[in-house]
């Protein structure tokens, strides 16, 4: 067990005396990097890029034998030290013992580098990421706001986000439910995205809601989800609960669009379409997610407008007003950050003197209240309530 104080993430690896050379993963992704005369095994590409940009992603979900989907799901990889760093040094089998030879075209080249996780001059990642929030928001909007024939703003997403199949289903009315899922902060952003989607769809016969990923997979799955579009939100793209839910809904016919911050992540491989926050490499290292949350909300609003356009919603003036306000958010965020000394003084004055805290809000502000509760709980280790104003 090891902990990096700058990152504040915890890593666990089970080791037995009899098999001290073995590493077992379940749910979380596992990557094998090919270096010069060495293999590197990590749960994310960020653990590899200092040494190599080539890696093999293990696939624990796809059965190797369709006639035995349960027994053949999962992979075992043996790495030969004498052939380290080569394809010949990798032996891959499924859980039922079937050989799965590795070919060169299965290797992925990383789109990220160590520059993407540089802390710069900041004392810790949290301050760096809070300060970068307006820039991340701008990057998320960049290239995704266009105009219609009347000069009014509209969302622009390509086929990499909404593939032709999903566009056709939306236009034909084959999709009548949109589920926005995530865990933790991503679930908070999902509430905002679902509310924006419902508002943009108006009186169309399409529902939009935001259950946590675990609630959907544990209690709300139906056998046939071919009428459902799932929007999965994850900063890292490796959130186990979210990714497992994506596997389950796809197996039942649902389409999946991911809002994700990390290129080459597990969720990117699983989704039908991807909308990257910022430029897909605006890495967030602090456990207390900040800039990713804002970017996820921005991406959720962009996707909501794009979906509304595909189903034929035509309210150009209202759409323009919403997107114009969205484009002004980075400047408002910068103005707020400029008041850091005043905010610090308020924190010093009120926080230590109050033992019990509660955060309240209404409507869209309730989303912010719930997210702020998560942030304060993570950073201050306090149990804090978040409610609608009337309930307090």
Where in the sequence are the language-model features?
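Short acidic (Asp/Glu) and glycine-rich catalytic loops that position anionic groups and cofactors
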Residues: 108-110, 117-120, 277-284, 306, ...
């Amino acid at each position: 067990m090891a902990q990096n104080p700058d990152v504040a993430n915890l890593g666990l690896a089970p080791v037995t005396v009899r098999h001290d050379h073995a590493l077992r993963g379940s749910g979380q992704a596992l990557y094998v990097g090919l270096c010069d005369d060495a293999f590197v095994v990590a749960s994310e590409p960020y653990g590899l890029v200092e040494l190599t940009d080539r890696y093999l992603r293990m696939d624990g979900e796809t059965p190797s034998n369709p006639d035995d989907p349960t027994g053949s799901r999962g992979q075992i990889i043996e790495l030969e030290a004498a052939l380290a760093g080569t394809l010949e040094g990798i032996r891959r089998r499924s859980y039922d013992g079937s050989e799965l030879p590795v070919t060169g075209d299965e290797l992925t080249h990383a789109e990220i580098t160590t520059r993407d996780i540089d802390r710069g001059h900041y004392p810790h990642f949290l301050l760096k990421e809070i300060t970068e929030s307006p820039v991340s928001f701008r990057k998320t909007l960049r290239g995704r706001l266009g105009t219609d024939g009347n000069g009014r703003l509209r969302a622009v997403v390509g086929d990499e986000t909404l593939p032709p199949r999903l566009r056709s289903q939306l236009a034909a009315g084959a999709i009548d439910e949109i589920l926005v899922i995530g865990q933790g902060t991503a679930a908070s952003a999902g509430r905002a995205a679902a509310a924006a989607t419902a508002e943009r769809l108006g009186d169309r016969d399409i529902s939009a809601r935001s259950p946590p990923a675990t609630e959907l997979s544990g209690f709300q799955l139906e056998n046939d989800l071919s009428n459902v579009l799932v929007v999965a939100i994850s900063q890292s793209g490796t959130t186990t609960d979210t990714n497992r839910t994506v596997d389950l809904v796809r197996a039942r016919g649902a389409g999946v669009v991911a809002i994700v911050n990390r290129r080459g992540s597990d969720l990117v491989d699983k989704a039908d379409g991807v909308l990257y926050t910022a430029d897909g490499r605006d890495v967030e290292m602090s456990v207390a997610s900040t800039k990713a949350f804002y970017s996820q909300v921005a991406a959720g609003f962009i996707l909501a407008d794009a979906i509304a356009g595909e189903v034929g919603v035509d309210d150009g003036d209202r759409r323009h007003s919403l997107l114009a306000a969205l484009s002004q958010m980075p400047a408002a965020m910068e103005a707020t950050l400029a008041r850091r000394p005043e905010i610090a003084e308020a924190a010093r004055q009120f926080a230590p003197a109050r033992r019990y805290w509660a955060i309240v809000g209404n409507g869209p502000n309730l989303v912010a209240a719930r997210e702020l509760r998560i942030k304060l709980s993570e950073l201050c280790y306090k149990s804090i309530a978040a409610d609608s104003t009337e309930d307090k």
